[in-house]
């Protein structure tokens, strides 16, 4: 089991110099940085500012790195979230409840959209699209009017809800610690107040990030690892292994971390077609 650390060396005095010195002291030839936007952002800066021999491998359940079609970890997270939504359907229907399912996704709603579509959610809320409480409530009311006395609402933890202020606590990358925000709870309260329907919350949290990976993620991680080894052997540093279509290719770390890959409006419209 590999350990991990969210320390940002560029935020700590002397930390970058220690990274460089430790690398030299151990007589290493290359570093493979495995992670998401924060980890690979640090890797990109180390390469750009210090010619550090680093290769990137995209690992994040958020699937929000623009340089690759998919990151490994994402498929597993979607599978876990979809299974949870499937299971919550039965208790929602038997108790005539609205079930709010909060999934991970700080800046983007890939997990919410994919698991919501796969699990048959009635409303899906993502950070890319502003949340309208009344629109959500009306969708649920319409279901009840048609005799559907239960609803499943999937919401990304990073959604901006009207009136919800961010918690003060942040990590070393400047991100709000989302577990302190309570997006799912705030949304559930609003739904219950506006509709009068009993509403419950399930926060999937870190269960999405652990356990056995799906076969797709296992294969993708293996392919990324092989590509990273080839790049290191060739001395082709400052690159990230990426999936483009069915091919694993190399893309510059700077390009891969320049911007986030957000959920396109078209994907959200696919999900929206099934709302209510």
Where are these regions (language model features)?
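Short, small-residue-biased leader/transition segments that mark boundaries at the very start
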Residues: 1-3
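Phosphate-binding loop/pocket of nucleotide- and phosphate-handling active sites
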Residues: 186, 239-276
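Short beta-strand elements at the ligand-binding edges of bilobed clamshell
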Residues: 67-78, 212-218
